[in-house]
């Protein structure tokens, strides 16, 4: 990612504690006015030792000459999958197959505070299903959403051939001011589609 010094003095970039599975480099560490630098982030999946979606916050501090230090965070997210490069055609023929009931979950117009219909616990919910249409067990490493306004529950971590799991998606309308457009990431061991995306939409 790029970073630019839009001020009139030099700016030095400092990083906070970096997770052990990340290698982060800032070049250059000190930017001159209007200079563009780069922050390079590399993730080592072998060091991480787990599969699925990984999200973390990287603290960053910027110190400009004669000014108060400014701090913030960079959100880093990645999907870690199996290495399918050595699978033969026969292996793939026996592999699990993840089938989703849909790739779009539309909640439509959300009720507001003045709505006549009361909300149960102030929430609305919907569901989607994942079915294993393959010949071997389907492992679901993670089902996540980076948007904190979306809660996920239910489902299973492993599905036998022919089995189906139901996942519940819950929204809190009071936290959505105008509209919501978010993605649910499904990471699994289906070699033909290890990462599946489900779009969630809602509006006021």
Regions inferred by a protein language model and the residue ranges of each:
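Long, low-complexity ectodomains and other extracytoplasmic segments of secretory-pathway proteins
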Residues: 4-9, 63-129, 133-134, 190-204
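Surface-exposed binding patches on compact interaction domains or structured appendages
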Residues: 8-38, 135-164, 168
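Short beta-strands and strand-coil junctions in structured, solvent-facing domains, enriched
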Residues: 10, 45-49, 66, 136-137, ...
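Well-ordered beta-strand positions in beta-sheet-rich domains
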Residues: 12, 28, 38, 57, ...
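Short structured motifs
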Residues: 23-28, 40-44, 100-115, 125, ...
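Short, solvent-exposed loop/turn segments enriched in Ser/Thr/Gly
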Residues: 37, 46-59, 71-73, 119-127, ...
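Beta-strand-rich extracellular modules
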Residues: 44, 61-65, 172, 187-191
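C-terminal soluble interaction/assembly domains
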Residues: 126-133, 141-145, 151-187, 195, ...
């Amino acid at each position: 990612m790029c970073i630019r010094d839009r001020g009139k003095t030099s700016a030095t970039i400092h990083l906070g504690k970096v997770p052990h599975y990340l290698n982060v480099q800032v070049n250059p560490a000190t930017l001159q006015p209007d200079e563009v630098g780069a922050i390079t982030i590399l993730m080592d999946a072998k060091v991480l030792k787990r599969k699925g979606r990984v999200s973390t916050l990287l603290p960053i501090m910027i110190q400009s000459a004669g000014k108060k230090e400014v701090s913030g965070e960079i959100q880093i997210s990645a999907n870690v999958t199996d290495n399918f490069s050595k699978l033969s055609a026969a292996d793939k023929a026996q592999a699990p197959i993840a089938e989703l009931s849909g790739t779009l979950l539309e909640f439509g117009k959300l009720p507001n505070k003045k709505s006549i219909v009361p909300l149960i616990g102030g929430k609305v919910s919907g569901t989607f299903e994942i079915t294993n249409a393959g010949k071997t067990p389907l492992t679901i490493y993670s089902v996540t959403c980076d948007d904190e306004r979306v809660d996920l529950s239910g489902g299973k971590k492993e599905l036998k051939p022919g089995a189906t799991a139901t996942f519940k998606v819950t929204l809190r309308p009071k936290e959505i001011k105008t509209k919501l457009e978010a993605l649910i990431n499904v990471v699994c061991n289906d070699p033909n589609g290890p990462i599946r995306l489900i779009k969630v939409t809602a509006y006021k």
